[in-house]
């Protein structure tokens, strides 16, 4: 990306990076906050800030190797300047960049990345080893390379209010061009990155932003109008809203989560979408699950996971993840499967899904569960790898309960 030589933009970038790297802020949230801090920035300014923050977060380890030191709060300007030197850009003649030596940076980059895949592709050693152990080095290396690509913005047409062709036309009238995707009936891809949340089409509830891979999960559950469906880890409701559309607003969806604030957000989104068959339930005790035992035609368990399938979209997670967290999340996944599967009625079904691509979070968890619960049978499963699909990575398994 070409440099925009305005100091206030670089102040915004370095402030955002400090909060992401040293104050545990999520990159997407911090970028949004930074962009809101100066209403005078135009679209090019905002794009420059967002892209630079995402790029430098994504390539953190490689940039550090080229700097010859780890990034710290007091060398963030040097860190950002190093990135632009590696991109072949000429830095502004500012005091903050005076220490940077282009020749040394390029030499260190060559030395440190030539024979070290983890440095070159900017991934922690432990995470590279984990993925290589589970998927095999060749497969994992392709996935790591794909993680470093920029993610497309994909939206899902809200069938309750419009169809894909009409939505394309409405967005085009607002200056936004989109393309369709084969095998994804409701998906549109934006040709250029833009803030679609400001469009009238979004305010009218005609679409939601949702990755193409994620859009397959609600379909995988095979819901029908009139069913009783539980989305047990609903969060802010991306898949809940899709289920409502697939059910044509008929039947009952219980959207559940342990975080009440997420359900509050879901209610707002449901109102905008015209989704009227959703009832939220805050999981604040085991009684909430017990009341629904053996009652649901379908249960969706989109469980918490490592998120290794969505690093392209959330590059800061590479630096926030720990082996301890992944081990704990696997225990949580099994616990959710054990407890929440009780809501499936005889003859009903559940879908277990994650945005991870690790077998230890996916196929292995399903296998363990079925061995302990022979009343459930694996009917179908799907693994989406970002390197093959071009979109986020997901796993989904459809389990049927005996009548």
Language model regions located:
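S-adenosylmethionine
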Residues: 1-403
């Amino acid at each position: 990306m070409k440099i925009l030589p305005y100091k206030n933009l670089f102040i915004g970038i370095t402030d955002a990076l400090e909060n992401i790297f040293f104050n545990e802020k999520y990159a997407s949230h911090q970028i949004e906050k930074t962009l809101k801090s100066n209403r005078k920035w135009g679209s090019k300014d905002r794009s420059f800030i967002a892209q630079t923050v995402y790029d430098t977060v994504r390539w953190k380890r490689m940039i550090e190797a080229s700097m010859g030191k780890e990034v710290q709060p007091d060398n963030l300007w040097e860190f950002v300047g190093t990135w632009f030197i590696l991109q072949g850009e000429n830095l502004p003649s500012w005091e903050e960049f005076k220490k940077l030596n282009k020749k040394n940076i390029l030499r260190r980059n060559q030395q440190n990345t030539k024979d070290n895949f983890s440095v070159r592709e900017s991934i922690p050693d432990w995470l590279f080893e984990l993925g290589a152990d589970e998927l095999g080095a060749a497969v994992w290396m392709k996935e790591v390379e794909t993680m470093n690509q920029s993610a497309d913005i994909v939206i899902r047409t809200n069938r309750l209010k419009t169809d894909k062709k009409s939505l394309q036309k409405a967005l085009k009238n607002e200056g936004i061009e989109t393309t369709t995707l084969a095998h994804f009936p409701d998906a549109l891809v934006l040709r250029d990155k833009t803030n679609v949340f400001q469009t009238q089409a979004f305010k009218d509830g005609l679409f939601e932003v949702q990755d193409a891979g994620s859009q397959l999960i609600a379909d995988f559950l095979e819901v029908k109008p009139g069913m009783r469906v539980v989305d047990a880890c609903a969060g802010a409701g991306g898949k809940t809203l899709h289920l409502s559309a697939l059910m044509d607003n008929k039947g009952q969806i219980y959207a559940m989560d342990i975080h009440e604030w997420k359900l509050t957000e879901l209610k707002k989104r449901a109102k905008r979408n015209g989704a009227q068959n959703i009832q939220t339930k805050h999981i604040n005790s085991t009684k909430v699950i017990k009341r629904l035992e053996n009652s649901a035609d379908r249960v969706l368990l989109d469980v918490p996971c490592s998120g290794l399938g969505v690093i392209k979209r959330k590059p800061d997670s590479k630096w926030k993840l720990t082996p301890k967290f992944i081990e704990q999340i696997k225990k949580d996944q099994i616990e959710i499967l054990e407890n929440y599967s009780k809501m499936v009625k005889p003859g009903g079904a559940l879908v277990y899904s994650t945005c991870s691509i690790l077998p230890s979070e996916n196929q292995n968890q399903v296998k363990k569960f079925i061995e302990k619960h022979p009343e459930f049978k694996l009917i179908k499963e799907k693994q989406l790898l970002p390197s093959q699909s071009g979109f986020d990575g997901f796993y989904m398994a459809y389990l049927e309960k005996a009548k």
